[in-house]
């Protein structure tokens, strides 16, 4: 049984479970049994395995996990043509992300410095100018704590942020955590993802990491998640070092 924190997240997750198990394959995601809209609750089948974030693995094993994650991510992104409404939402996603991150500047207790805000706004402006990027159905929170390892492979859980969007937001958390000091994991992911990112997508991904850094100091405390807060601070510090004159 899952209880979502808002009607928006409940609606997203319920919709995702309406077909994601077919898209990803047997045992690769929970299956929806029944939904209780009045309680924002979903009754789901159990998925075998344990969170990858808790696993003790060597470099080769982690690369294997990222290959499987790349395969599941590709299946989700290529799940089928978006209808008119979903495509409109997906194509507006990057502008919406820039607008949403701007709002976080005004509500976070750990407010970025003036220089940090200037760097962030520069990336937000660049993101708005990138133009059309490949879109699809994204997981929205793809990372090891939402990957379950079991003998037959890997499963995805927690689909409350699943939505139509540009595809690159699914790579942001991996880019600023898993891949940052482990380039072999990134390479393994893209070996099975099916294609390399375009130059515009790589640039968009960098811009989105800046937005994530600004979101984290607000989103972390909101969800009592110190890991998210720390992630934002690390990313912002790195961006400031890279943007020194």
Residue locations for each model-derived region?
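Glycine-rich, phosphate-binding/catalytic loops in enzymes
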Residues: 17, 60-61, 155, 172-174, ...
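A glycine-centered beta->alpha junction motif in the catalytic cores
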Residues: 43-59, 102-107, 210-227
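Active-site acidic catalytic loop and adjacent metal/ATP-binding pocket
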Residues: 124-171
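Regulatory N- and C-terminal appendages and interdomain linkers associated
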Residues: 242-245
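ATP-binding pocket architecture of kinase catalytic cores
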Residues: 1-88
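Active-site activation/catalytic loop segments of kinase-like enzymes and analogous catalytic loops
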Residues: 169-197, 209-226, 237
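An alpha-helical support segment within catalytic cores of ATP-dependent transferases
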Residues: 59-63, 78-140, 232-235
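Conserved protein kinase catalytic core
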Residues: 8, 51, 147, 164-166, ...
């Amino acid at each position: 049984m899952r209880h979502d924190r808002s009607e928006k997240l409940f609606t997203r997750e319920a919709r995702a479970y309406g077909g994601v198990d077919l898209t990803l394959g047997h045992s690769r995601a929970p299956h929806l049994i029944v939904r209780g809209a009045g309680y924002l609750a979903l009754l789901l089948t159990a998925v075998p395995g344990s969170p990858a974030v808790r696993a003790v693995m060597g470099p080769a094993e982690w690369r294997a996990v990222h290959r499987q994650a790349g395969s599941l991510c590709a299946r989700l992104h290529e799940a089928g043509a978006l209808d008119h409404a979903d495509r409109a939402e997906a194509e507006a996603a990057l502008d919406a992300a820039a607008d949403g991150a701007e709002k976080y500047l005004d509500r976070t207790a750990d407010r970025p410095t003036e220089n940090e805000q200037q760097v962030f706004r520069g990336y937000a402006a660049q993101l708005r100018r990138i133009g059309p990027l490949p879109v699809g159905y994204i997981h929205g929170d793809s990372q090891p704590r939402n990957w379950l390892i079991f003998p037959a492979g890997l499963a995805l859980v927690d689909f409350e942020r699943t939505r139509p969007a540009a595809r690159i937001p699914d790579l942001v958390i991996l880019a600023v955590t898993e891949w940052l000091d482990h380039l072999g994991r990134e390479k393994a992911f893209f070996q099975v993802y099916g294609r390399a990112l375009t130059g515009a997508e790589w640039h968009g991904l960098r811009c989105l990491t800046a937005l994530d850094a600004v979101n984290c100091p607000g989103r972390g405390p909101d969800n009592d998640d110190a890991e998210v807060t720390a992630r934002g601070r690390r990313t912002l510090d790195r961006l400031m070092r890279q943007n020194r004159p």
